[in-house]
A protein has these predicted regions:
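Signature of the first transmembrane helix
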Residues: 3-63, 95, 99, 106, ...
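Specific pore-lining/lateral-gate transmembrane helices of multi-pass inner-membrane transport
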Residues: 69-86, 248-365
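Membrane-proximal transmembrane or re-entrant/amphipathic helices at the cytosolic face
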Residues: 415, 434-474
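Interhelical loop/hinge segments that connect adjacent transmembrane helices in multipass membrane
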Residues: 1-7, 172, 188-230, 234, ...
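Membrane-water interface segments that mark the loop-to-transmembrane alpha-helix transition
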Residues: 8-22, 47, 59-103, 116-119, ...
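Hydrophobic alpha-helical transmembrane segments
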Residues: 118-119, 150-196, 215, 365-371, ...
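Small-residue-rich midsections of specific transmembrane alpha-helices
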Residues: 18-28, 45-70, 125-133, 186-189, ...
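Alpha-helical transmembrane segments of multi-pass membrane proteins
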Residues: 53, 57, 92, 96, ...
Length: 474
């Protein structure tokens, strides 16, 4: 299969996986909000935000570093096995840290449920670590359809078990156990698939581990900072305002997680192309790939952001019921930040490709300080609305900074021709939604048709020039 078809297939496979997993996530949210109630659902969201934090935090940049190494030199298979061994070796101490910190942060008498649920979820750290470490092998080979298959399988297992939890009337502990089992299924299938193309026996090599950490750490610190400020709002909200506030915010947050997962399939497809263009110092090709990816991301973000703002009450009511009506405002706020994250992620990968990790680190540190300071000041008074506002403000600050950095490092200034067409389509879509009866399915169909029709009339597909992206040099 040639490069164009491989990139297209990877993109399609991951997009399909995101649709399926997002659908399963919506189903589980629908079930759990009604079964557990606001506070119970708040405990579940707290756990699902808290545990993955440690997986990404202790990634130390290894995932992206290994992908970059394997993309440039496929013969360096030991890098994969070294990183796999290192990630597994880090899993035990990170699990202990996660447990100890949970006992400290949620030590109140009324927070026993949260503490116990986190303890049940601790195996997630190992399973998610293995899945992440093995997934890089497929990412570097542009075979992300395997990762997509495993992700769907794991989500399906978890969703099936959550249905049993609800039918059986079990507690939040059983719901957390279902998520752990789904993560195990995902990791196990990835290991089985990886064995067909590479040995998955971890290498015990402390000296090479140290060298890996030294090389990956600048990037790792940037990613650590990014995950802290992405998850800090929900964690701080759970500490400062309790499970009920997290339950309300959790509806918006879970939708945010589902939405921002979609651009990931494009990032992982174009990152090897960006890396190789940067390694050849082919800035024209790098800018071309970046522009085409930027256009696709903007086209996707505009209807998501404007559509969600327009029909947020219908979304919340359908997803969680009238007990969660207060989630409408934070949803409208965080969805703006989600749209900004589409583009921010791409620009961050461009900086990584051109070896500007240290600069990216300082940018993330500045944004994190901004985020934490505002959250600590505003959450005690404004609760989940403050958390949502700070998250979106942080993404806006990050966008401005990244645009400047990408311009300086790669000479890239985004052309806004496609973005302008998307804005016109979005405006027409919102106008159509304003006169459409309040039925979620009907609103989604009308909005999608209106947006798509405007894009076709403006011949937006001709402006995308996707063949240039798919035909980028490798």
């Amino acid at each position: 299969m040639n490069l164009a078809r491989r990139v297209a297939w990877n993109t399609l496979a991951q997009a399909a996986a995101r649709v399926v997993t997002a659908g399963l996530s919506i189903v589980t949210t629908f079930l759990l909000t009604r079964h557990l109630g606001v506070s119970g659902y708040g405990v579940y969201v707290t756990v699902m935000v808290y545990i993955p934090f440690f997986v990404v935090f202790f990634d130390a940049g290894l995932t992206t570093f290994v992908v970059r190494s394997l993309s440039v030199d496929e013969a360096r298979s030991n890098v994969f096995r070294d990183a796999l061994g290192l990630r597994i070796a880090l899993a035990l101490p990170m699990t202990l840290v996660a447990f100890a910190l949970a006992m400290l942060l949620y030590r109140g008498g009324g927070e026993a449920t949260t503490r116990n649920a986190i303890a049940i979820a601790l195996p997630l750290i190992l399973f998610m670590t293995v899945a992440s470490a093995v997934g890089v092998l497929f990412q570097a080979r542009l075979e992300m359809d395997r990762v997509a298959t495993a992700e769907i399988f794991g989500q399906a297992v978890a969703a099936s078990l959550i249905v049993l939890v609800v039918v059986s009337g079990l507690s939040v502990y059983a719901a957390v156990g279902a998520a752990v089992t789904g993560a195990f299924a995902n990791a196990a299938l990835l290991l089985l698939l990886a064995r067909r193309i590479e040995s998955v026996r971890p290498l015990l090599a402390p000296r090479r581990w140290a060298a890996l950490l030294r090389k990956a750490l600048p990037l790792g610190l940037s990613l650590m900072i990014a995950v802290v400020y992405f998850r800090a709002d929900a964690v701080l909200l759970s500490i400062l305002k309790g499970a009920h506030a997290v339950g309300i915010y959790g509806v918006a947050y879970r939708l945010l997680e589902a939405v921002v997962a979609f651009p990931g399939f494009l990032y992982v497809s174009v990152f090897p192309l960006l890396t190789q263009a940067a390694a050849r110092r082919d800035l024209d090709n790098l800018r071309n790939v970046t522009q085409r990816a930027f256009d696709v991301l903007v086209l996707a973000a505009v209807p998501v952001v404007l559509g969600t703002i327009a029909i947020a009450p219908e979304i919340v009511d359908a997803l969680a019921g009238d007990r969660f009506d207060a989630a409408v405002t934070p949803l409208r706020i965080v969805i703006v930040g989600a749209g900004l994250m589409f583009v921010n992620g791409l620009f961050a990968y461009v900086l990584i490709a051109v070896d500007w990790q240290v600069t990216l680190l300082w940018t993330g540190a500045m944004t994190l300080a901004f985020n934490l300071a505002l959250n600590l000041v505003l959450i005690p008074r404004y609760s989940y609305n403050a958390a949502a506002s700070v998250a979106t403000a942080s993404e806006a600050l990050m966008l401005v900074t990244l645009v400047v950095l990408v311009m300086r490092s790669a000479g890239f200034i985004p052309a806004l021709r496609v973005a302008a067409k998307a804005a016109v389509g979005g405006a027409v879509m919102v106008a159509c939604l304003a006169v459409t009866p309040s039925n979620l399915a009907l609103l989604v169909v009308v909005g999608g048709c209106a947006y798509g029709a405007v894009l076709l009339l403006l011949r937006t597909h001709a402006s995308l020039q996707l063949r240039q992206l798919l035909g980028a040099k490798r």
